[in-house]
């Protein structure tokens, strides 16, 4: 089977108002197999989200190519579901309606869509919260609603852009375990962007490292050989986890410091 997503020698350059160009990503190649969980880590502003947007078909590369299950990608990647860092819930709709709306807009009868939405809410422990509006939910609860809002449409690929970034450490850990439970159930291809190296190792099969920008490149690709299923808290105290973290950090640290210097610490 061809990779779920394959980026080959992708470069992305943006035109500046001054007439010049800014190279965000340069010559990046990355393949994510069906059922594989791959995390991308790099300094702030290195182009991680840009690369994810290319995989989603939201940004066309300046050069290079993208294939989805072996077919060239032209336009939006309709095989993928995208979970952003910012919440995408409609504030005037209940949790149940927020989850069901994707099915309804795709033509599923309302009653059937709501029934499936209720089932999905149950899978993330929110069976009793379907009638609540987003402002009545905690940050972690809203993230769970957002996650099943994407998963209910059964995408073959899941693109995730720092989805747990705004959450506190304890809630991030809970969400990480929940994500792994859901992923273990059907093993979708996942491309997960994070700035947190520990999170990347704990969740993924592979950790891909990007250099500081501009013209960020993929400079490292590690296989995570930790056993599954995993518990986020427990796996972090394993010697093999700590050894891998030190090994990756030895490369990542220099890029983080370089990115920090380039942005003035912003």
Q: Where in the sequence are the language-model features?
A:
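A short, proline-enriched helix->beta-strand linker immediately N-terminal to the Walker B motif
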Residues: 152-156
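Conserved ABC transporter NBD signature motif
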Residues: 64-75
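Catalytic Walker B motif of ABC-type/P-loop ATPase nucleotide-binding domains
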Residues: 158-161
């Amino acid at each position: 089977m061809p990779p779920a997503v394959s980026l080959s020698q992708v470069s992305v350059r943006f035109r500046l108002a001054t007439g010049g160009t800014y190279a965000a990503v340069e010559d990046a190649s990355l393949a994510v197999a069906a059922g594989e969980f791959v995390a991308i880590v790099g300094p702030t502003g290195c182009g991680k989200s840009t690369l994810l947007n290319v995989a989603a078909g939201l940004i066309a590369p300046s050069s290079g190519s993208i294939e989805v299950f072996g077919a060239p990608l032209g336009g939006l990647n309709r095989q993928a579901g995208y979970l952003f860092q910012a919440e995408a819930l409609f504030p005037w709709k209940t949790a149940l309606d927020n989850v069901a709306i994707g099915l309804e807009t795709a033509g599923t009868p309302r009653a059937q869509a709501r029934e499936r939405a209720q089932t999905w809410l149950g899978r993330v422990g929110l069976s009793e919260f379907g009638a609540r509006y987003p402002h009545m939910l905690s940050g972690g609860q809203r993230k769970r609603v957002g996650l099943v809002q994407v998963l209910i449409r059964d995408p073959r690929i899941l693109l995730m852009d720092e989805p747990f970034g705004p959450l506190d450490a304890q809630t991030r850990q809970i969400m990480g375990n929940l994500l792994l439970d859901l992923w273990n159930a059907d093993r979708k291809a996942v491309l997960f962007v994070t700035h947190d190296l520990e999170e990347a190792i704990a969740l993924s099969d592979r950790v891909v490292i990007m250099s500081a920008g501009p013209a960020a490149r993929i400079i490292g690709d590690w296989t995570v050989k930790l056993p599954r299923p995993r518990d986020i808290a427990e796996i972090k105290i394993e010697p093999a986890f700590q050894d891998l973290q030190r090994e990756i950090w030895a490369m990542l640290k220099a890029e983080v410091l370089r990115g920090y210097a380039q942005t003035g610490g912003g």
